[in-house]
């Protein structure tokens, strides 16, 4: 019988142990990176007003049916009103910082009036060819002017009588300067061929916008087509027909207004989901969450976590 020598593999264990430790280290590293970088995508966000987004940190991708803009450096996004966009927000090292400013229609009219007539004619581009999402790089004093306008729009009335919610004299004194502040913010944007047509079209109030504004003025109310028709002194049949001519319907606008209001309240961070549901006309919180998720493709809790940055 031949001698058989059994060789122990004990000398291979350190190598196996090191490999296991390496796998564990890589797993932990991936988990740490994942915990530091959170991402959420919000779909079907209706842009009801000419909107500026002050982007400070993180990563942001915004798109519609034709345009896609990717941001990973500080700057400002310009969004034409009455479009539907998808937004992806991503933290970088745990940080995501941005702010939103919706420009009232009448303010755009005042801004457009500052542009020389020959420049308006020269730079006008047909609506169907115009881009609807733009990015402009950061520049000195942009953030300060952005913050000033945000304060002014939240404090002042639509007229030039000054501030209605506080005693801040600067709100009253700077009322007439608001169009010039806007002009300063949009300097880079106004160099683009499409800019003047976009400002002009956004300064005009469509029937869709009128209906949207009526519903948004009281989102908790259970609106009906007849209610809105009475507000604008129009028959229900005429209202339906004219909205169809603009490519929309009362039910679509109603849902957009309620969901946008919900997103706005959740982004501010002063309301919990139950309160937001009630403020947007939903008696059932669970049904509201269901509608929110179906509309935006994300849950209210996930939206709050990212948007509150």
From Swiss-Prot:
Its biological purpose: Activates the expression of genes on pathogenicity island 1 (SPI1) that encode virulence proteins involved in invasion of host cells.
This protein's UniProt keywords: Activator, DNA-binding, Transcription, Transcription regulation
UniProt cross-references to PANTHER family, sorted A to Z: ARAC-FAMILY TRANSCRIPTIONAL REGULATOR, HTH-TYPE TRANSCRIPTIONAL REGULATOR APPY-RELATED
Alphabetized GO MF terms: DNA-binding transcription factor activity; sequence-specific DNA binding
GO biological process: symbiont entry into host
Residue ranges: DNA binding: 226-247, 273-296
InterPro entries in alphabetical order: Homeodomain-like_sf (IPR009057), HTH_AraC (IPR018060), HTH_AraC-typ_CS (IPR018062), Tscrpt_reg_AraC-type_HTH (IPR020449)
HTH araC/xylS-type domain: residues covered: 209-306
Mutant lacking the gene: phenotype: Decreases invasion of host cells.
Name the UniProt record assigns to this protein: Transcriptional regulator HilD
Keyword Transmembrane: no
């Amino acid at each position: 019988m031949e001698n058989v020598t059994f060789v122990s593999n004990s000398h291979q264990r350190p190598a196996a142990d090191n490999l296991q430790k390496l796998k564990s280290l890589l797993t932990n590293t991936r988990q740490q990176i994942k915990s530091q970088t959170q991402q959420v995508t919000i779909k079907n966000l209706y842009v009801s007003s000419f909107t500026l987004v002050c982007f400070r940190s993180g990563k942001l991708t915004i798109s519609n049916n034709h345009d896609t803009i990717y941001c990973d450096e500080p700057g400002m996004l310009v969004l034409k009103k009455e479009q539907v966009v998808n937004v992806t927000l991503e933290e970088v090292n745990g940080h995501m910082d941005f702010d939103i400013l919706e420009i009232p229609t009448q303010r755009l009219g005042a801004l457009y009036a500052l542009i020389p007539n020959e420049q308006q004619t020269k730079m006008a581009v047909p609506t169907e060819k115009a881009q609807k999402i733009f990015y402009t790089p950061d520049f000195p004093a942009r953030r300060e002017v952005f913050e000033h306008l945000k304060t002014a729009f939240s404090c002042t009335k639509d007229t030039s009588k000054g501030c209605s919610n506080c005693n801040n004299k600067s709100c009253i004194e700077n009322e007439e300067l608001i169009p010039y502040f806007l002009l300063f913010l949009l300097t880079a944007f106004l160099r683009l061929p499409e800019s003047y047509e976009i400002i002009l079209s956004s300064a005009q109030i469509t029937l869709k916008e009128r209906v949207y504004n009526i519903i948004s003025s009281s989102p908790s109310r259970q609106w009906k087509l007849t209610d809105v028709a009475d507000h604008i002194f129009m028959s229900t049949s005429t209202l339906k027909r004219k909205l169809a001519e603009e490519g929309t319907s009362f039910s679509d606008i109603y849902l957009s207004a309620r969901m946008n209001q919900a997103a706005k309240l959740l982004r501010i961070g002063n309301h919990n989901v139950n309160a937001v549901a009630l403020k947007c006309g939903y008696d059932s919180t669970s049904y509201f969450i269901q509608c929110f998720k179906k509309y935006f493709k994300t849950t209210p809790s996930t939206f709050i976590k990212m948007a509150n940055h």
